[in-house]
Regions:
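Nucleic-acid endonuclease domains
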Residues: 1-82, 87-200
């Protein structure tokens, strides 16, 4: 074998490691792992819009139409005439976190919605958004995320807020009312009640 062909062998070995570590291989949602980041966001927006339509909740969600550079002017759309920024994340291969890129001005929406997709279920977390001061002073993001602060890279640019299955399960366990776990047994009516209980 020569150095040129060595790369073929190294790539094949790495691909095999990926296949073994692929948490999505048996998931109904497996194709989300293959989508580009922007398309993952579109999936979340479409999901939330269709849930609202099913439950006859007034909504107009289409980030492509509402988004401005750096986090937009009022999020990805509206639910019950309130602006909502929707962030969709897929569980990383290490199964440790959902990474939410919030943009440069995340405070401009009234509400934030996180749609966190894991191989066997989905977490939908909706909460009243934080103020500009809250984001910029990196305060803890309670009550939903009392141990987390948004990250602001170098004090400028985009903000980020990562969550995890454990954090989401904690929100549910403490009955905070801001997170619901969507499984094969979850009904549209349950999701409608959940959305209506938060967005007034």
């Amino acid at each position: 074998m020569n150095p040129y062909n060595l790369l073929v062998s190294v790539i094949a070995a790495q691909k095999q490691k990926e296949l073994v570590a692929n948490i999505w291989k048996d998931s109904k949602y497996k194709y989300i792992a293959e989508l580009e980041s922007n398309n993952v966001g579109n999936v979340g927006e479409n999901l939330l819009q269709q849930i609202c339509e099913n439950q006859q909740i007034a909504s107009s969600i289409d980030g492509a139409k509402t988004k401005l550079k750096g986090g937009g002017d009022g999020g990805d759309g509206r639910i019950k005439n309130k602006s909502v920024e929707i962030k969709t994340a897929r569980l990383g291969a290490n199964q440790a976190s959902f990474q939410h890129e919030l943009g440069e001005h995340p405070w401009k929406a009234d509400y934030m919605a996180f749609i966190d997709v894991a191989p066997a279920h989905i977490y939908l977390t909706i909460f009243p958004n934080f103020t500009e001061e809250h984001y910029k002073t990196l305060l803890k993001c309670g009550p939903c995320f009392p141990t987390k602060s948004a990250t602001w890279r170098k004090g400028e640019g985009a903000f980020k807020l990562d969550t995890s299955p454990n954090i989401n399960e904690n929100i549910i366990e403490k009955k905070m009312g801001n997170c619901i776990k969507i499984t094969d047994d979850t009904t549209f009516d349950e999701l409608g009640v959940f959305i209506n209980s938060i967005i007034q």
